[in-house]
């Protein structure tokens, strides 16, 4: 291994609160070699992001202090240099890529100018030179028309292109180290793979070092040279990725590896297929469904208005007790379809029949039955719950509206619902702010069960959760569908989860169903090129299964061909 460009020794960060001191980082030590990608993994709250912010002295609160330890950047201790020197280090020597580019790009400043600003500050170029350099960087990070796109604003780009712009801003100062803090968490699987390949190509061409923060072991297995595992502010273990993944020493690392959803493998059990004696009458039947929206055209929707086919000719059947997964990228129509099923989005044409009632022909009666018999679990567990109500009050409210449980029996039913979702009964007295994301999602599932539904629609309900919590929620769904004969429509962009949970998989692309079938068959022998592309883009925890495996999803020249980087001395 080459010499360390960054060496952290016994770094300790404490929070000084009115109630006393609290250790947030506990004597963390690690090394980053030149040209190396180090994966920093762990659940939310493990200290990953705080560690990286501590490296550049950007602690999120004045109550937090670096108490001891050292951060050596090529021999210089960053904990001891002046604030003026630290300003030059940030961006100039250590660049940062954040999780949500929308929050970190200036919404009223052109993309090109945001890159040029850093170039002028750190490299001392004039406006014309900085503009030329910024255009070159836009091309390097994959913008197809960098000259014209220089003038565009962040809101004019997709999430993936905004993340490319964020990488461009970080590269503008030619740093020695890039810190990428969950740079792909909010992105679709294919866009995620493109960003990861871009980071690897940048490393190869520029010779810089990267710290990649993530909670997904599949990502680090595919992209990183070494892995460091954190929990509770401590570094539990680190080492070469193959050694750590094949011979983990710490029980927590073992749990992380076991919790990672597996992709097609003969040794991994898949979801059970529907039973032969399943009723012939479908619970939900969708026939040639179309949902169209008019966009643009100004206040009066004039000649400039365009029609978007959000859902186009979708036909689908769900049998009682069946678990069906719908997968696809953002904009594929998954969530629009879910909202249409629940009557939250008007239908342009087609039919939705729920338990024998056609919602188009008997809308009032159909919606009344649907609201009684169907429920939804949302993506963001915090925003989906009323912050003013305790969990018990929230469940009581639903039970009263539902009207099936006598008032005297409601407290007992609340306790039963909490038991069903694996929460202790004392959670009835707690509000969402005092609960973790996984606990809030369990409460959201309890609320859905409170209506005693036949159908549950789960819309990206585990996307915001850590991998171990994801595994717990998936197992909860599996148990509930088995115990209660629930029909589950599970919407996700994570194919590995769908493959492990769902009996059937439906693949949507641009509003249409492009493939449908038993999960085992879809994943083992995909028929549509788009399905094959989605599967190829999933980072597998086995480092020998290469990302994309020869599949080019970009439809553009490879990143390696468009990155004329100069290697740093």
Label the predicted regions.
Residues 3-4, 21, 144-151, 241-290, ...:
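Short catalytic/signature loops enriched in Gly
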Residues 65-77, 350-358:
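Conserved ABC transporter NBD signature motif
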Residues 77, 129-148, 358, 409-426, ...:
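Conserved ABC ATPase "signature" region
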Residues 78-95, 121, 242-248, 300-305, ...:
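ABC ATPase NBD coupling module
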Residues 152-157, 161, 431-435, 439:
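Conserved ABC ATPase signature
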Residues 174, 452:
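Conserved catalytic motifs of ABC-family nucleotide-binding domains
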């Amino acid at each position: 291994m080459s010499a360390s460009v960054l060496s952290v020794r016994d770094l300790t960060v404490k929070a000084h609160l009115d109630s006393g001191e609290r250790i947030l980082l506990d004597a963390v030590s690690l090394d980053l070699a030149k040209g190396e990608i180090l994966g920093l993994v762990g659940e939310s709250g493990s200290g990953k992001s705080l560690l990286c912010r501590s490296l550049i002295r950007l602690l999120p609160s004045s109550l937090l202090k670096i108490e001891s330890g050292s951060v050596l950047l090529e021999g210089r201790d960053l904990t001891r240099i002046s604030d003026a020197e630290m300003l030059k280090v940030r961006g100039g020597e250590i660049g940062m890529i954040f999780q949500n580019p929308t929050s970190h790009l200036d919404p009223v400043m052109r993309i090109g100018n945001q890159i040029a600003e850093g170039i002028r500050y750190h490299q001392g170029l004039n406006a014309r030179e900085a503009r030329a350099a910024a255009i070159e960087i836009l091309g390097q990070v994959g913008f197809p028309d960098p000259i014209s796109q220089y003038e565009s604003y962040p809101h004019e780009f997709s999430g993936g292109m905004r993340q490319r712009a964020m990488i461009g801003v970080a590269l503008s100062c030619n740093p020695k180290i890039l810190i990428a803090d969950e740079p792909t968490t909010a992105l679709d699987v294919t866009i995620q793979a493109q960003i990861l390949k871009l980071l690897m190509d940048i490393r190869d061409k520029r010779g810089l070092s990267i710290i990649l923060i993530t909670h997904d072991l599949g990502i680090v297995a595919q992209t990183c040279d070494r892995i460091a595992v954190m929990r509770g502010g401590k570094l539990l273990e680190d080492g070469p990725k193959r050694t750590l993944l094949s011979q983990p020493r710490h029980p927590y690392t073992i749990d992380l590896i076991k919790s990672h959803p597996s992709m097609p493998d003969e040794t991994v059990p898949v979801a059970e297929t529907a039973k032969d004696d399943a009723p012939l009458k479908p619970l939900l039947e969708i026939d040639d469904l179309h949902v169209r929206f008019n966009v643009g055209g100004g206040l009066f929707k004039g000649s400039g208005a365009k029609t978007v086919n959000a859902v186009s000719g979708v036909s689908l059947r769900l049998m009682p007790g069946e678990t069906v997964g719908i997968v696809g990228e953002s904009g594929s129509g998954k969530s629009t379809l879910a909202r249409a099923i629940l009557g939250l989005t008007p239908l342009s044409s087609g039919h939705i029949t729920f338990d024998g009632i056609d919602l188009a022909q008997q809308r009032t009666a159909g919606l009344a039955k649907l609201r009684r018999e169907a429920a939804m679990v949302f993506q963001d567990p915090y925003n989906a719950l009323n912050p003013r109500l305790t969990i018990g009050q929230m469940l009581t409210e639903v039970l009263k509206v539902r009207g099936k449980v006598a008032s005297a029996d409601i407290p007992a039913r609340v306790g039963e619902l909490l038991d069903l979702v694996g929460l202790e009964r004392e959670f009835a007295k707690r509000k969402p702010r005092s609960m973790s994301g996984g606990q809030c999602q369990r409460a959201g599932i309890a609320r859905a069960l409170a209506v005693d539904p036949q159908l549950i629609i789960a819309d990206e309900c585990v996307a915001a959760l850590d991998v171990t919590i994801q595994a717990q929620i998936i197992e909860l769904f599996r148990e509930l569908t088995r115990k209660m004969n629930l029909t589950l429509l599970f919407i996700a962009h994570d194919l590995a989860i769908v493959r492990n949970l769902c009996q059937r998989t439906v693949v949507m692309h641009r509003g249409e169903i492009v493939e449908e079938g038993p999960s085992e068959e879809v994943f083992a022998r995909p028929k549509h090129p788009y399905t094959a592309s989605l599967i190829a883009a999933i980072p597998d925890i086995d480092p020998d299964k290469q990302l994309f495996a020869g599949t080019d999803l970009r439809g553009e020249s490879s990143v390696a061909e468009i990155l004329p980087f100069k290697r740093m001395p």
